[in-house]
């Protein structure tokens, strides 16, 4: 049934942000109104709708200034249930689909698939229109069809413990949701461009986005990635994330340590016989009840000690990182940086991130570029913690995609968005200056930081940036209705 479409209560900053072949589907039934679209094991259930004014109001609730974000369409949301392989079975999982409502349905939309961050409660998944799920309305409001997988063990799947930071299942949940979109009759009759698939995610979603990009490039040639932008993800679990975590006397989220161990045990089956082999009592005996899919992360963290020596069994940390140990083998299996992207890839990070250490992005960038990647960048968004970094990374990726994509104008089959004719700022990232328009042009522009504060204005073709702090900025061309992301790096 449809949810109440009253505005969700949105905090003022982004929060901390883990068979059968679907091509064999032969029949589908399209129903209208509050009905459900069925395609064998797939269903598309209406879960919400926002017209253009409501999307604009939602952007204001998220603190997105109109100078940086101007949607062009209303959006309808659907919960998708679809099949994917997991371990030795085919399982039914869920995800969210956000479709533009005011664009010509025969004009193919670009597709943005967003991989969500760490959650513990199943109903916090995107298809329940949770806080992070609300981002789908904003992303789709720019003219994209947006997909958000819930992942295994979350959303409608109550048969599994969520396999946290498990690259294979993260990637499969995204790839099979994309496949469901392209192989099923669309609930609104919209068309989609398989050559414009953009991938992003933040935190665990950054890890999942990297895994999905790798999976699509390697095994799904029919769905080439146009660009991807993972944010603050643990790409190098063996080389960065766990060594940095274990080197400190405390960790900001002890729930993550337990989540990882329990999840990997559920997948690999050889890490331990009992959680008490890794964790001290009384905590070890409490973990099954805490990770029940209904207990929020803050409550789990409050139940566990932040000092690692009070939580993890003595000597276990050294053992976990020993080559050949089951935990170390599982860690290596879930590293997602040792491959060579063929499409442009940006990794956004912040240097004060206390949850996912920024060296993950630097190690991934170094490996990829040293081994032949030509369009990979690690982008420093500044000295922000994990929560404050999220908005810049998620919004920056969204507008970076928007600057590259061909987006349909509202209700037009012939006219395309001007974004395919935009002068792309260069160099970008910039240090001392950035050129934002051709030398002969004299369009008025304003430069804004990620909070929407105006920093400069003018008509010159170059902007001096040497006095600006590192981070994400946007140049706004009011007359053309364009907002282009610029990264200042040092």
Label each PLM-derived region with a short phrase.
Residues 2, 13-15, 37-40, 416-490:
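C-terminal outer-membrane/trafficking sorting elements
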Residues 41-104:
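Catalytic-loop region of hydrolases
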Residues 164-187:
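Alpha/beta-hydrolase active-site loop
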Residues 212, 343-345, 357-367:
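Short alpha-helix in the alpha/beta-hydrolase fold that links the catalytic acid
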Residues 231-338:
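Accessory cap/linker subdomain of secreted extracellular hydrolases
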Residues 323, 328-329, 355, 362-363, ...:
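C-terminal catalytic histidine-bearing segment of alpha/beta-hydrolase fold enzymes
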Residues 346-353:
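Short beta-strand/loop motif that positions the catalytic acidic residue
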């Amino acid at each position: 049934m449809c949810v109440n479409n009253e505005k969700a209560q949105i905090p003022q900053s982004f929060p901390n942000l883990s068979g059968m072949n679907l091509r064999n589907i032969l029949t589908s039934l399209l129903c209208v109104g509050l009905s459900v679209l069925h395609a064998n094991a797939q269903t598309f259930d209406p879960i919400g709708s926002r017209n253009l004014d409501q999307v604009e109001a939602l952007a204001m609730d998220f603190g997105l200034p109109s100078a940086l974000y101007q949607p062009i369409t209303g959006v309808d949301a659907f919960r998708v249930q679809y099949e994917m392989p997991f371990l030795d079975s085919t399982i039914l999982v869920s995800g969210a689909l956000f479709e533009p409502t005011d664009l010509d349905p025969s004009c193919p939309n670009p597709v943005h698939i967003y991989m969500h961050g760490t959650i513990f409660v199943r109903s916090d998944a995107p298809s329940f229109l949770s806080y992070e799920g609300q981002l789908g309305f904003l992303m789709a409001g720019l003219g994209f069809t947006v997909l958000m997988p819930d992942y295994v063990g979350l959303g409608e799947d109550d048969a599994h413990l969520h396999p946290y930071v498990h690259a294979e299942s993260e990637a499969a949940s995204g790839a099979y949701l994309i496949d469901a979109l392209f192989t099923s009759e669309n609930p609104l009759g919209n068309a989609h461009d398989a050559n414009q698939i953009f991938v992003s995610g933040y935190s665990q979603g950054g890890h999942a986005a990297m895994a999905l990009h790798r999976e699509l490039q390697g095994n799904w040639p029919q769905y080439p990635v146009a660009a991807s932008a993972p944010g603050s993800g643990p790409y190098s679990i063996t080389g960065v994330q766990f060594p940095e975590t274990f080197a400190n006397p405390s960790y900001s989220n002890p729930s993550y340590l337990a989540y990882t161990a329990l999840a990997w045990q559920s997948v690999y089956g050889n890490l331990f016989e009992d959680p008490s082999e890794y964790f001290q009592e009384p905590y070890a005996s409490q973990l099954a009840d805490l990770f029940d899919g209904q207990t929020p992360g803050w409550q789990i963290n409050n139940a566990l000690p932040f000092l690692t020596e009070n939580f993890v069994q003595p000597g276990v940390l050294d053992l976990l990182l020993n080559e050949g140990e089951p935990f170390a083998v599982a860690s290596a299996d879930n590293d997602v940086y040792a491959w060579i992207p063929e499409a442009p890839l940006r990794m956004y990070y912040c240097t004060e991130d206390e949850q996912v250490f920024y060296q993950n992005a630097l190690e991934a960038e170094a490996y990829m570029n040293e081994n032949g990647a030509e369009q990979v960048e690690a982008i420093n968004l500044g000295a922000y913690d994990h929560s404050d970094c999220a908005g810049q990374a998620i919004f920056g990726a969204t507008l970076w995609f928007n600057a590259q994509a061909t987006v349909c104008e509202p209700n037009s089959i012939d006219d395309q968005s001007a974004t395919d004719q935009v002068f792309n700022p260069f160099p970008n990232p910039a240090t001392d200056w950035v050129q934002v328009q051709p030398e002969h042009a004299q369009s008025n522009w304003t430069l804004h930081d990620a909070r929407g504060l105006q920093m400069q204005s003018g008509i010159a073709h170059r902007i001096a940036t040497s006095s600006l702090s590192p981070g994400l900025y946007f140049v706004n061309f009011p007359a053309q209705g364009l907002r282009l992301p610029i990264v200042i790096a040092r």
